[in-house]
């Protein structure tokens, strides 16, 4: 029996956007109500997705500037990044382009990304919205996905567990079934550009790199 394929999944994003809560929720099926560590301990377990078993390794990172020099050490060998921002924090949304994409493309230029908007429960809470109107919409999240060329965009809530499993199932699928980005040989003068069309469809409309 062959060994399960190992997939290293690294979560990145601003501090306090809920990366660690999301990981704890995914691995324990419950929302942490007491102490929440700054960084989640590395986790590894066999996971079944679409009938295929993989060994999923989860790596958490601290988003604060104090860890900027150490954080890239976690990127080595990564198969997929889960890049998170908070749906109730415009600053964390803007930092995806300002901070995180430059960092990821510098240290891991060819690793695919799943973009995740966290704290969905608060964005959908009418009581919360009464005092906080500067939230990120689904349309804005999808626009950002296209801008950075992420393979997928998912909104989730660790508190209600909505879509948390979908985040990591999607990350696994992206690694197992990467978008086709083969270029048509240039020696053929009458090529049909079919490679670009396929990549766009598989990626859900994103532009192939």
From Swiss-Prot:
GO terms for biological process: abscisic acid-activated signaling pathway; small GTPase-mediated signal transduction. The keyword Nucleotide-binding applies. It is found in: Membrane. The keyword Ribonucleoprotein does not apply. A motif (Effector region) lies at residues 35-43. A lipid is attached at residues 196, 203, 206 (S-palmitoyl cysteine). It is a lipid-anchor. Although this sequence has a C-terminal -CXXX, it is palmitoylated at Cys-206, rather than prenylated. InterPro entries: P-loop_NTPase, Small_GTP-bd, Small_GTPase, Small_GTPase_Rho. GO terms for molecular function: GTP binding; GTPase activity. One of its GO terms (cellular component) is plasma membrane. It comes from the Eukaryota. SUPFAM superfamilies: P-loop containing nucleoside triphosphate hydrolases (SSF52540). GTP binds at residues 13-20, 60-64, 118-121. Keywords: Abscisic acid signaling pathway, GTP-binding, Lipoprotein, Membrane, Nucleotide-binding, Palmitate. Belongs to the small GTPase superfamily. Rho family. Acts as a negative regulator of abscisic acid (ABA) responses. This is Rac-like GTP-binding protein ARAC7. The gene is ARAC7.
């Amino acid at each position: 029996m062959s060994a399960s394929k190992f997939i290293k999944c690294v979560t990145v994003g601003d501090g306090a956007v809920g990366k660690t809560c999301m990981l704890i929720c995914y691995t324990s099926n419950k929302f942490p109500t007491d102490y929440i560590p700054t960084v989640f301990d590395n986790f590894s377990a066999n996971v079944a997705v679409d009938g295929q078993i993989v060994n999923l390794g989860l790596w958490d990172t601290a988003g604060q500037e104090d860890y900027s020099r150490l954080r890239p050490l976690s990127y080595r060998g990564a198969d997929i990044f889960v890049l998170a921002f908070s749906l109730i924090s415009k600053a964390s949304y803007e930092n995806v382009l300002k901070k995180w994409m430059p960092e990821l493309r510098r240290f891991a230029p060819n690793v695919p990304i799943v973009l995740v908007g966290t704290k969905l429960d608060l964005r959908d809470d009418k009581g919360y919205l009464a005092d906080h109107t500067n939230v990120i919409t689904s349309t804005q999240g999808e626009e950002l996905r296209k801008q950075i060329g992420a393979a997928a965009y998912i909104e989730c809530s660790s508190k209600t567990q909505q879509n948390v499993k979908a985040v990591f199932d999607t990350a696994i699928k992206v690694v197992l079934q990467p978008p086709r980005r083969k270029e048509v040989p240039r020696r053929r003068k009458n090529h049909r550009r079919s490679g670009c069309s396929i990549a766009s469809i598989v990626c859900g409309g994103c532009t192939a790199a």
